[in-house]
């Protein structure tokens, strides 16, 4: 017994010696650009999540650091944010930081205290990812802190704190995202320049900017949104920029496995599994995931199955060169229940009158980014990207008030191939004592889309083969496109608090269409009387210059006042050229849209418990593309939706957001934390300057005049409880503001309100989350569709329950 105690005592002493031997320390000095010590600078070490501040002499010291990889982040108010990766092996390390006056790195500091201060949403700093955001309205959703239902990509919850968004909710599985801001159409988020990790992911950035692929929010670190002022650096869209920022592997571990398994109503199942880490020398970081998702859907005939995979490697080639490679694969098949009329929706929103409609998407993306740091003031980024993708839809496109009696279905196929490069340069220099920043770059983009439409099979299965594949019955087109662009923006810092940021973007666009379309004349019985074929070979070039300017004033009381003006441009879509659809007709003389966006806003924080933002905006269109009702051709003379440049338009609005940290927990979590937020938008969007008196001064379609979202998040120890209320005002689906039509393609979209609830429990490596979407079982719809996945009313999901089990090893 004495011998056993002696052995145990020796083991304890030896283990303690080993632990002490592995502990390290790091210390150093933090100075400004002139070498003057900075007192009160913040330093955060991860994964310990410990934060300290420098003393009056600018020095810092961390002790008792365990062995392994660590990251040290240093920042100060109004100064640069820097990261230092290091490996501890029991020795003392010295590292000094020199912080410039303008931040160049905007990656969020992912620690609990910082997330509490940011409330789950933050703003982009002046310079981020080789672009300038000074004087622009921006929002960053921090996904690490959100309580949204991530398994379903629920946009109502994920984007609840982003102001002024109209959200389509007809896709309860999160396969496609449909959001539009400030009166812009939410259709597949086409009003935004949509990217992931800074590169394009849409079908065709010029002629078909629709997003059939949506990155899973479970894999994201953040979502960055910049309003119309992003047109100078990222593209010409009126909506601005939407960028999905993927997670990276943890810096402090060689491998970390995260697995999330979710089950829910209507046979929903989602399995998300990711692996990431950093090699022992700290030079190679990797992250990847695989996702499988399936469900039967809220409505009859609305089942789906999806697979999604992603891999990313970041390698430090040297102290100045960094390489990042991304690969993405996504594929899904979904049955589409079709639309409903107003009457059938009131009877039962879950019913379906289309059992033969299917939709398939196959998306493949690749990107290579190379960054070079010439010196602390000059950096270069070269990002190349490519897409090979396709979408196919087969089904009955007839109006929903016409029964499906069988026969050949309409098959529409799109194949997308594009490649591009963006090269960006950031340069910092001083004029007097003020640091100035220049961001400049070029873009080269080449795309090709093949669009075909013809007769598919007469069955009910997911058969995407043409009856005559060599010559489809409706159309077969190639749409090549070329885009060359150059931009420059410059922050002129007049003083410590006031800056002016002008910018220019020069664009060259060449689009072409080569192919044929066929026209048919039918008798009263639906038989073909005559048919004709027209071949086309059209090319078009455009060159133009966009300009903008931003102003920013930062008061000493943590308040910023900003103003921005930027020109915008939107090219017509390929789908506006040759798509045969019995529900709408496109004007053959349709042309591009032009206009501008203007912002005036203020934002800030009161202490660390209250943040707010108030913005007034004006969006102007010249020749806005819209849809009006017209009388169709004989013999039926049915109303049709006619798509053309119907009028000029202007959108005026006010957006406000605030969040209040009512209760703030301590570092140990022994006190409860309570956050409240409120998101409000008033928008008045009308058609002006038009010869068509039927739409003069009418409301622009798909623009709710009032949007309100509010929520609360309560955390105590290992538990969190959250709830959200969302209200969207009534709006119209066409420019004539029709209230009710027989086809249900046009009509009023009534106001609706939705309540979501959730509760979660976290213990070390385990997390359990329960969500109730649409807790009050509101029966509503957000969309009337003229084509797939309709036509007609597309109901939103009713009450649904979800349970997620997550573990991290």
Predicted features, each with a name:
Residues 425-427, 496, 613-620, 638-736, ...:
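Gram-negative outer-membrane beta-barrel transporters
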Residues 222, 229-231, 241-278, 290, ...:
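Short strand-turn segments of transmembrane beta-barrel domains in outer membranes
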Residues 622-623, 673-674, 727-739, 760-809:
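C-terminal beta-signal and adjacent terminal beta-strands/loops
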